[in-house]
A protein has these predicted regions:
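Short loop/turn segments that flank or connect secondary-structure elements
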Residues: 1-186
Length: 186
């Protein structure tokens, strides 16, 4: 949901279905924003999820399997680590001001350059109306998200190349430190 405050209708009766049913893949920029904004270390909110061998992702072994960065899911409710139950059937993001770009732009995507509502939206029918939404705000967030993912893939490539050149395995803690500082492990 866009942060403008003008688009809360879709989330007003939120039960957190999107935060429970989607895996939330995040960028390096998202990790840094969440860490700085919540004062949490990435090990407290990230998990490395293995991805198909044809996809690019962070590796912890030279030429090893790739992983994407996902927000941790709580075993108790299956939801995102930041999902807060505020009342029965009502949930909100506990890191709202620092939430990932994919969450910020939900439930929209760009179709031929125009903002559109995802066809697989988890909210109830009629929750989102383009006529009532801050379309310039969503467009800005979507364009920003595309740029962040472009930068993310450059960082993934740099990490993997450095790992391949150095030859030792890297622990997840090394990767998390790299995400925060940009410094490769020694």
């Amino acid at each position: 949901m866009n942060g403008s405050g003008e688009n809360v209708a879709g989330c007003a009766s939120c039960a957190g279905r999107c935060c429970r049913e989607y895996r939330v893949a995040v960028t390096v920029a998202d990790v840094r924003t969440l860490a700085a904004g919540t004062d949490l270390h990435p090990r407290e909110f990230l998990t490395l999820r293995p991805v198909d061998s044809t996809r690019n992702g962070f590796r912890t072994r030279p030429r090893g399997p790739a992983h994407e960065l996902n927000l941790v899911r709580r075993p108790a409710n299956g939801g995102c680590v930041f999902l807060m139950e505020i009342a029965p059937g009502k949930a909100r993001c506990g890191a709202y001001a620092h939430r990932p770009l994919v969450c910020r732009s939900y439930p929209t995507f760009l179709r031929a350059g125009a903002v559109a509502v995802r066809p697989d939206v988890k909210c109830g029918p009629g929750s989102w109306s383009l006529a009532a939404m801050d379309l310039p705000g969503y467009r800005r967030d979507l364009v920003h998200s595309q740029a962040a993912w472009t930068e993310h893939w450059k960082i993934v490539t740099a990490w993997n190349a450095a790992l391949d050149a150095a030859a030792p395995d890297a622990a997840p803690a090394d990767l998390y430190e790299f995400l925060l500082t940009g410094a490769m492990p020694r």
